[in-house]
Amino acid sequence: MSDASANGDATEGAAPAAAQLPKMQILGQFIRDLSFENAAVQYGTATQGQPDIQVQVALDARKRTVDNQYDVIMKLKIESKTKDEDAPKSIFLIELEYGGVFLIENIAEQQLHPFLMIECPRMLFPFVRRIISDMTRDGGYPPLNLDQIDFVALYRQQIAARQAQQPVGTA
């Protein structure tokens, strides 16, 4: 009998602590926009040697009308060009907007924006990497396996750029 009451007390004491733990759940994922332009095939661009590949990443997060739900969108622009110094020619261009719908609970308001812009993209990235890899392979190229993205550094760059755009000396 004493064991039951001890367990009951422990359970009651643990419930408020468990309720305060941060919670993230992916409710859904989707491709908003996808484009693969295979210029090498269209225009006969030679693809000899290692191409120059540029990857641009942008992130966006918006609150949905439902409580604690957010859309997080990862936008990638990947351009592959020949390494011809005189006039580099496009080999392929990929543009992808990939999104996730997230349920976020028990995150402090001041931590919510970094959480949405760092942790949520980390969850989406493996799926984005696979889409890019499959698309380049299906386009007739070796699969392009994107390197891991440092979302913390990307977030810091976005904050610094936003602060640089603000007028100096405003009070």
From Swiss-Prot:
It holds the Pfam family SecB. Coiled coil: none annotated. It is found in: Cytoplasm. Keywords: Chaperone, Cytoplasm, Protein transport, Translocation, Transport. GO terms for biological process: protein folding; protein tetramerization; protein transport. The keyword Transport applies. InterPro entries: SecB, SecB-like_sf. SUPFAM superfamilies: SecB-like (SSF54611). GO terms for cellular component: cytoplasm. The keyword Transmembrane helix does not apply. GO terms for molecular function: unfolded protein binding. Its main location: cytoplasm. One of the proteins required for the normal export of preproteins out of the cell cytoplasm. It is a molecular chaperone that binds to a subset of precursor proteins, maintaining them in a translocation-competent state. It also specifically binds to its receptor SecA. HAMAP family: SecB. NCBIfam families: PRK05751.1-3, secB. Homotetramer, a dimer of dimers. One homotetramer interacts with 1 SecA dimer. Belongs to the SecB family. This is Protein-export protein SecB. The gene is secB.
